[in-house]
Amino acid sequence: MNSFPWLTIFVGLPISAGFLIFVFPHRGNKVIRWYTIFICVLELLLMTYAFSYYFQLDDPLIQLTESYKWINFFDFYWRLGIDGLSLGPILLTGFITTLATLAARPITRDSRLFHFLMLAMYSGQIGLFSSQNLLLFFIMWELELIPVYLLLAMWGGKQRLYSATKFILYTAGSSVFLLMGALGIAFYASNEPTFNFETSANQSYPVTLEILFYIGFLIAFAVKSPIIPLHTWLPDTHGEAHYSTCMLLAGILLKMGAYGLVRINMELLSHAHSIFSSWLIIVGAIQIIYAASTSSGQKNLKKRIAYSSVSHMGFTIIGIYSISDMGLNGAILQIISHGFIGAALFFLSGTSYDRIRLVYLDEMGGMATLMPKIFMMFSILSLASLALPGMSGFFAELVVFFGIITAKKFFLMPKILITFVTAVGTILTPIYLLSMLRQMFYGYKLFNATNSYFFDSGPRELFVSIAILLPVISIGIYPDFVFSLSVDKVEAILSNYFYS
């Protein structure tokens, strides 16, 4: 048990600081923006300090644990803790949220509410990744919905209300299954419900009941990850959201679903996970092909990037359901890698829109001459997205491939077939990404756009782009940094699978 409540501070600081925005007199949008950035940076520095000094990388057990009695009526505890599985997503959350807040500079309407919602999302994300209680996990899961809905509905594009409504219907509807699964596990074979992850992990269930629990959690996490065919909210949401919101969606929100698949489905319901693994690997392979093919046909820039996110999450799904050491480590690396790359691509698409006011690729062209810095950053990060060697995505996808091949659960021919289909998906990736670069930056100049918007990337845009690019290159050169966080925890999870 940790003597100092680090995790409670990390969860409570952003939203508490957000409430202060409404308490203090309004001093202008600039003051609010820098105050929010200061809170995000302070949170990130505190997390880095605490994890550097108090987290032991070689310990697979839950660390920095905190447990406080919250509701006496049904023995509900505020229980937090982190391990190698949650450490990476927490640091990713702090990093991306800080940069997304800096990227939100053009926001001037209802600035106080906007920045409060950003900080509220920050608290919810940290709370979810550090939760060690099923009900607390659900509360933090739900805490995300209202801020994202308002960010979409109030600061989105022309179809923002449609996209926001579609988002809330999908995510809130799927959350019902998450709650049902949590209550089912808590009340099973006990008059006094327990939501504790550790207790639930040691519980055994009848096969039929475990499958029902598993399906409930799977639906909730499949919507958020997303997994086809429950992905259709994502392109519309990304297509209409402000690019700072897109950074949070692509960088963190999608990772919550993948994290839930490992933390709950894989760790708590191992037998059902084994039963569903063959089917979900097939779904993951189809998702890579389908989303990559669909992305090539998208004329809207942000929707093309959104479908590329769906395709890349297919590798995460395959890694999780390979039930192998290399596959699961590759999936975790893909979660981190795509968090950076997806956020960067949406940021660059948004800064491009700020200048040319165009969203359709067939209306663009010739931007390389007009905006060479944006062209350079867009090109480098697009190459990172297609898994160029030396970038983080290369090792993530390569290790997932190795995970499929070395998986002991599957026969040789199915493994070869899945590997082949997945490899075809990696061939489609450069097709839609390089086509996107060609349509945007080469060809004829933008005669139908106002010349006043033709200014290149400024210091803010360059700082955000380079800040994201550096960890992408660093992980690509030295992926062991991420593997060192997760390898012991992955080994502990797979110890529940006799063929791992």
From Swiss-Prot:
One of its GO terms (molecular function) is NADH dehydrogenase (ubiquinone) activity. One of its GO terms (cellular component) is chloroplast thylakoid membrane. Keywords: Chloroplast, Membrane, NAD, NADP, Plastid, Plastoquinone, Quinone, Thylakoid, Translocase, Transmembrane, Transmembrane helix. It is an enzyme of class 7 (translocase). The keyword Magnesium does not apply. Its EC number is 7.1.1.-. It comes from the Eukaryota. Belongs to the complex I subunit 4 family. This is NAD(P)H-quinone oxidoreductase chain 4, chloroplastic. It comes from Populus alba (White poplar).
